[in-house]
């Protein structure tokens, strides 16, 4: 796939395809508080885009708009457009169930359900699809294979998932997210609660998964963003300050705020 030329200007739209998610004039409000301000961003298909910035800058808020998780809470409002494959997912006509099957999400802390390893992976499938037992077995195995967990758990699928290590639990959460065969995978600080060895394994997994999925990751770890992402967006106080190729952001940022943040002068 041809690499996408991304301009240094935060608000300049991408002009080269393929684009998986296109954000147009996006604003977000917690009641009367404006958390995101006129965000314009294009996220390329089957690449890793990292969102960085200090706590409270809006990066996790932006990530969670991509699957409309905010709809669970009152007095939260998104304005503008978020186009997934050309369709505005913020439209009331866009089904939440359809969106959740297309966009998987993994959170900061591993949250396996208190059930077997098998049932953790099968849980979402049962709510969205009807299939035979053999088809379900194949789908569960495929998800565990893709999350690099199959060889470790194939002989204990009926054991409680809470018995897995922290790193295994997070890979199980990834398996659960991709079991529905989404096209987008959202990762909200997926390694912040893990040890260095588990973190390294998750980072290797991200590199493997981007051949199949468009990945957006929120991270406070500058080194991690530099290692795993193809593109990086720097956010500050609800604004997207700069968005470019990761190597450019970390070596030749165009905005002083970006340079100050990645060099540790603030944040």
UniProtKB/Swiss-Prot annotation:
InterPro entries the record matches: AAA+_ATPase, ABC_transporter-like_ATP-bd, ABC_transporter-like_CS, P-loop_NTPase, PstB-like
Catalytic activity: phosphate(out) + ATP + H2O = ADP + 2 phosphate(in) + H(+)
Annotated compartments: Cell inner membrane
UniProt record, GO biological process: phosphate ion transmembrane transport
One annotated Gene Ontology cellular component of this protein: plasma membrane
Topological type in the membrane: Peripheral membrane protein
GO molecular function ontology, one term from the record: ATPase-coupled phosphate ion transmembrane transporter activity
PROSITE patterns xref list: ABC_TRANSPORTER_1, ABC_TRANSPORTER_2, PSTB
Domain ABC transporter: 21-262
EC number: 7.3.2.1
Alphabetically ordered keywords of this record: ATP-binding, Cell inner membrane, Cell membrane, Membrane, Nucleotide-binding, Phosphate transport, Translocase, Transport
Positions that bind ATP: 53-60
CDD domains linked: ABC_PstB_phosphate_transporter
Function noted in UniProt: Part of the ABC transporter complex PstSACB involved in phosphate import. Responsible for energy coupling to the transport system.
Protein family per UniProt: Belongs to the ABC transporter superfamily. Phosphate importer (TC 3.A.1.7) family.
UniProt cross-references to PANTHER family, sorted A to Z: ABC TRANSPORTER I FAMILY MEMBER 17 (PTHR43423), PHOSPHATE IMPORT ATP-BINDING PROTEIN PSTB (PTHR43423:SF3)
Quaternary structure, from the entry: The complex is composed of two ATP-binding proteins (PstB), two transmembrane proteins (PstC and PstA) and a solute-binding protein (PstS).
Protein name: Phosphate import ATP-binding protein PstB
Source species: Xylella fastidiosa (strain 9a5c)
Higher taxonomy: Bacteria, Pseudomonadati, Pseudomonadota, Gammaproteobacteria, Lysobacterales
